[in-house]
């Protein structure tokens, strides 16, 4: 609030943020953000720093896939992935056992795709054998969406079993690991994940506003071969 010509700023240093995100930002990170910056598009050094940071994220996620950092909260990566992968009429399998799992259907529909819901109890992780039985009956999907950790419930799905199973049926994967990566092990290459999305405001313990996306060569090819 404003008092006269002076702004009164409440001291929040005594508070501890215990929400699942945005999380408490460490003091050294907060201080680093207070340093002077340049215009990224005019600073040649920024491109080297950006590339190095992307490579470090790839290393942490155990992948040779390209990593990009986007300016926006984690949900930006989820929509960007669906927007880039979906063409009108594409059937997309939505693995739904949580709020964010179900939310993928909206993104797919927005870009003309046909979301096919595979819905399970929100209190239980996906059973890989049950999913396999389902896929034996219907696996005609361009890609599938899966949430690693669904933030509201804390539901943790085993992406290291789910994604390889989907790949065995020729189905690419878009994986939401916004609240999973760096808090739980993620080995992108071992799990054969095509697109993995994360965010800065969860286990990275940074402020909100950045999205991390890793993209496989197969996913890039699908994007390049779009007809629309």
Where are these regions (language model features)?
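Single conserved hydrophobic/aromatic residue that forms the stacking wall/gate
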Residues: 1-9
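A generic structural signal for short, non-catalytic loop/turn and secondary-structure boundary residues
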Residues: 10-12, 62, 206
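The feature marks the mature, well-folded catalytic cores of soluble enzymes
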Residues: 12-15, 88
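A glycine-/small-polar-enriched, mobile loop at the entrance of the PLP active site in fold-type I
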Residues: 14-71, 75
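Conserved PLP-enzyme active-site core in the AAT-like
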Residues: 19, 23, 28, 52, ...
């Amino acid at each position: 609030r404003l008092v006269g010509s002076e702004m009164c700023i409440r001291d929040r240093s005594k508070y501890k943020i215990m929400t699942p995100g945005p999380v408490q930002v460490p003091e050294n990170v907060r201080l680093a953000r207070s340093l002077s910056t340049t215009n990224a598009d005019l600073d040649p050094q920024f491109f080297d720093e950006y590339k190095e940071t992307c490579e470090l994220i790839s290393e942490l996620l155990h992948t040779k896939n390209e990593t990009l950092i986007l300016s926006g909260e984690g949900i930006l990566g989820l929509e960007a992935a669906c927007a880039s992968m979906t063409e009108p009429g594409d059937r997309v399998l939505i693995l739904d056992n949580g709020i964010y799992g179900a939310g993928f259907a909206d993104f797919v529909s927005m870009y003309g795709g046909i979301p096919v819901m595979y819905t399970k109890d929100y209190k239980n992780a996906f059973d890989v054998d049950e999913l396999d039985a389902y896929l034996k009956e219907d696996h005609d999907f361009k890609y599938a969406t899966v949430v690693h950790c669904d933030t509201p419930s804390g539901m943790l799905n085993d992406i290291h079993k789910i994604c390889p199973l989907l790949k065995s049926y020729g189905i690419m994967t878009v994986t939401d690991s916004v609240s999973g990566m760096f808090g739980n092990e993620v080995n992108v290459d071992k799990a054969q994940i095509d697109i993995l999305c994360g965010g800065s405001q969860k286990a990275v313990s940074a402020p909100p506003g950045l999205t991390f996306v890793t993209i496989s060569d197969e996913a890039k090819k699908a994007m390049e071969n779009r007809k629309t």
